């Protein structure tokens, strides 16, 4: 009786699973199968084959795929695990179901197929990437969410942010530019007000200091997001805002696999501020003048248009004075022209009704606009500002593996047009990842990522306030071109006063080349030692070159040569970080221990030079290629060199008993040269506990439909070292304006005086975030339905901010630890595999999160 009730429960769960897929809108991924038709001289007679598919407990497997090998002929099992299929005699059937090993079985005429599927332990023990290692998902004590390859492949994202979008707890902004990869990322709320609150990025096990556009989404195998302090505390000073771990693809054993893909799309502007077309522009001027000139109190005491009077009680403007004569009859037009009130204007000799209408709207203040209006010439400034951009993303890769070597190579090219005219972005990306097993105890590997990208353009200005250049504020009766067919500098009037703005005229006098060349590398070696020990060395050097060449021609009409010329700048970054990791992993009966000790160091150096050349003679016609002729007193140059370091020591202990009770503890000590001399080191740690209650005896009756149920509890503390200028805790000397005469031994010298412009902050401490998390994880029907729920509370103290000082101190502010920020919230994620067979996959994902800051 009890078994039957469980069977009914399982059927109900399956029905609910299918209904969930219909209720929630989710893209459906269809795997296309090539169909090849061969001509045959004879046709074999098909026969009916039936059978029952069950699991190890004897329960029917619902929705298992049964496929005739080498064909697209297939079916799925019903609620009793039964199937019937017409096949060629002696053919082989492929039976598969998520969470179970795939089985091939040859048919025998007249014999039913009764098959018991065995669980696929590799799928049930899904591995996630955590700090400095991996863990089974079942063993996690912290809040970790994994974005698997199927989502990446199905959605074909164009940026890392697109991959992350939709993950519960993550807030991903939108970047409407052609680049499209500068969208902000926020995990579980804003942790800090005065410092950077973005999550730490880890690429293939090493901290990543570049921008996310350098990572090709097509190269990503999986992403793991460490949300709570327990899972992220291993990264200490850089993990207060969470950690996003990106793992790139590697080859699989077998023949080389070649993938080529193209992603073509268009971009259009979203809702933007309203602009006036020709009809709207006229109505605006009519309504504005009616309100400004004619609004007044009528005989009935009410206020309305055309009620304004002079001191004698005469109407200033009669009703309909600002009406468009083209909407009136011939008789009405004559009355409209002659009835002008006290302050109105009437027809001039030889003037048309339309001309009078234009004068009443004061278009005659701009003869150019007046002429265009009378002749019906208009410009659509919206089309001149926006466009439908065409985006191209091409990728190719080759990968493979042998028993000793694993390799993956890829190339990618992006050429994007933004929705704003002139907004463009292009980039070339390549990636090489290779690992080799030199001996049974030594493995080495390298990961080299290269990118060359443009990073600037001269796009149409949209302006941020009324005084900024913005073509959308031009009249539709303004002129794009002058009478000679050249771009008009002042499209509204032809004069600087109320002249409007024409991007295309100004663009002739500007040029820009700006971009980055980046090389990210990771080199590693791993030695397997006796007694469960292993040692791994990783080092990640990073090189970045930046160039910026900007030309502003002094030939721009009405421009000052002293303010025009060439800006040339370059910079170079060299960063490296390394770690030495010792891991001990040992199982004693029902006890599982994993211990990790890590020593880490990093260094960052930055150099830049900038030249601003002005008033170049005899001409700046050579653009940014010529600066020698600049006026030295009107030009300037600057340099900036930055150097900072960090070091860390950390450890993590994981213990599991019976794969049922888990404990994780971490401790990390971080040192950073950017902090005050009295507090360069910070200590961070965490504790996490989890209980797989589904393994308890009292849950044995639920094993038929529940794969796993787990309770998680965690507490931890993380730090934040990202507070801008790495020298802000040191005092600073600056050159004062002007000069002074200095006398020594009767001799005078003219010197530039120095003064202290910044007060030292030797007592600045680490910004710390403490977090508590409680979570539940569930898996049903062999992983076909999963659920994760988390409640968290985070509190940031000793926030690093600028504190104002009284004026008598001689300084405006000092860096200090001020204030607190608290975040608390709830997250839930539901994932289901509604249908999965050889030709069709239907997955559904639902996420919900709420955060209170």
Residue ranges and their predicted role:
Residues 74, 84, 234, 397, ...:
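Short, surface-exposed charged micro-motifs
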Residues 55, 78, 310, 482, ...:
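Acidic surface patches and DE-rich sequence motifs
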Residues 152, 198, 427, 433-442, ...:
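Extracellular/periplasmic, surface-exposed regions of secreted and cell-surface proteins
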Residues 1-417, 421-431, 438, 443-445, ...:
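Short, small/polar-rich motifs associated with maturation and membrane association
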Residues 273, 278-362, 451-494, 601-622, ...:
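A surface-exposed, glycine/aromatic-enriched loop/edge motif typical of exported proteins
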